[in-house]
Amino acid sequence: MAEVVQSGPVEAQARHVVYCGVCTLPPEYCEFGGTAKKCEEWLKEKQPELYQRLHSEEAISANLSTLSISAQERAAKDAAKKEAKAALAEARDAERKAASKVQIKRVERNKRKHVTVIAGLEVYGLENKKVAKELGKKFATGSSVTRSAAGNEEITVQGDVSDDVQDWLLEVYGKEIPEANIEIIEDKKKKGSS
C-alpha cells in the first residue's frame, strides 16, 4: 500500500517589521510625523540598508518623478512647514524645561513626623511611579504618587530625606535635571486652634 503524503496549507511566515525608535511608526511612515529629521537620523544610524532603500538619491528622485510639478511644490512646502513646526515645538519644550523647577518640600505631619514631597519631575520626562519606587528602595521608606490640590502628580516619601533626595536626583538623573532647577522648601503645618 502506497503512503499518500498530504500537503496541507503551508503556514504563513510572520513578517518582521522594523519600527522607528523615535516616533514608533514603521520608517515608511516617519515622514508623516513631526519628527522626520530625527527619524531619518535614527534610521541612518540603526538601519543603514533600509535608510538607503528609503532615502537614497535614486529613491527620492523616483518618487518625485511620479508627482506633478504642482504636487512637488506642495510637498516641499508641507515638508518645510512640518520642519518649522517641529523645531518650534522643540524650542518651546527646551524653554519649558529651563523654566520649570523640581520642588522638594519637607512637610511636618505631627510633632516629630515629616514627609518629603517631590513635585515637577514629569516636565523632565521622568515617570513618577518609577521614581517613587526607586526612592522607596533607596531610602527604605514608603513612597507613593499622589495628586496635589492643584491636580498635579507628586511623590510623597515618608521621613525627612529632602537633602538626600536632592543628592540622589543629581546623581541618578543629573543629565535630565540641572542642579539649578532643584529647590528645597521647608513647609511647616500650622497648629489648629483647639
Curated annotation (Swiss-Prot):
Keywords recorded for this protein, A-Z: Cytoplasm, Ribonucleoprotein, Ribosomal protein
Protein name: Translation machinery-associated protein 22
SUPFAM superfamilies: eIF1-like
Keyword DNA-binding annotated: no
SUI1 domain residues: 102-173
Gene label: tma22
Compartments (UniProt record): Cytoplasm
GO terms of molecular function: mRNA binding; translation initiation factor activity
InterPro entries with a match to the protein in the record: DENR/SUI1_TIF, DENR_C, DENR_eukaryotes, DENR_N, SUI1, SUI1_dom_sf
Domain topic, free-text comment: The SUI1 domain may be involved in RNA binding.
A Pfam family this chain is assigned to: SUI1
Main location as per UniProt: cytoplasm
